[in-house]
Amino acid sequence: MTSRREFVAKGFGTALVAAVTPPIRAQEPRSAHGQSRAGAPKSGRTTGKTALRWEVFVTPSIPVITSDLAPGEKERPWPPISSTVIYGERDAVLVDAFITVEQSRALANWVAASGKNLTTICATHGHGDHFFGVSTVLERFPDARFVARPDVVAIMRQQASPESLATFWNPRFPGQISSHLVIAEELTGDVIDLEGHDVVIVPLGFTDTDNTTCLHVPSIGLIVAGDAAYNGVHLRLVESNQQGKRQEWIAALDKMESLKPRAVVAGHKRIGNEDSPRIIAESRKYIRDFERLAMTTTTAQELYDQMLKLYPGWLNRGALWSSARAIKT
């Protein structure tokens, strides 16, 4: 099996540059398992259409300015973030963006190197680390639409509020976030047309926050999961501090699994990991392990330590520490 190609932004506090260029035109049509091959249309709607392709751009961890550190840790990096481009013969749809101006310029350069016409940018959910950089991308692609479901837009407005920026985002990333944030327009309906193929926005409800979605491309078996699934990165369960919320997240994972995807791209993933559908089951197991250990431990430290024993190699221990404290304090 041919290993799939992943494009990684290089740099740590310096200008970010795509590691491989050009990112898209050189790539053969690939299956959702990562093999390079033509994708066969699955419905009459797509017969005769150019098969869609997709690529993932991952920006590495960047340092966060905070004193809120996990036990034994000297720093708290923000985990890698992924952005996915889905494209046909001419046009492309970009799913999610990044936090900082530098990250987002690298993303825009990567998309521009493809020569594709970026028609649409879609946000899977309202967390700022997946849309603050859209304004920077739009400087390069001013004709692209930035869209999301109305309930996602409501969360975006909260994240981009002066209070949220002043108390959370800007102190953690001083001078790095655009001062001209844009909010998505509310999308009417749940389907984006890409050269005759459906890109379906699937409402998932609560996952790591309220009103989340994933994007499903039936013709190529792809799900872009946003933060509904993680890949080698500790899940952010801070907002899931009640059992009912964690069960809602599991139900969302079940819903994605019912679509029978052949590839699933997580919003936060360890660089180099495959975009395998097994990350749905892995994310579900993580939540269930957290749930089980939450009932058998008494302190945040104990819960944190027990989860680390199960997931020693996963990134972003700071998120695990915050999750443990959210239900033990």
Walk through the language-model features, giving the residues of each.
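Zn-dependent metallo-beta-lactamase
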Residues: 4-90
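Metallo-beta-lactamase
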Residues: 41, 92, 99, 153-205, 209-210, 219, ...
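Conserved beta-strand hairpin/beta-sheet module of binuclear metal-dependent hydrolase folds
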Residues: 56-113, 117, 214-226
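Short catalytic-loop micro-motif centered on adjacent basic/acidic residues
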Residues: 93-96, 119-123, 200-201
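Extracytoplasmic/secreted proteins, especially bacterial periplasmic and envelope-associated proteins
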Residues: 106, 132, 136, 248-251, ...
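Accessory terminal helices/loops
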Residues: 258-263, 270-329
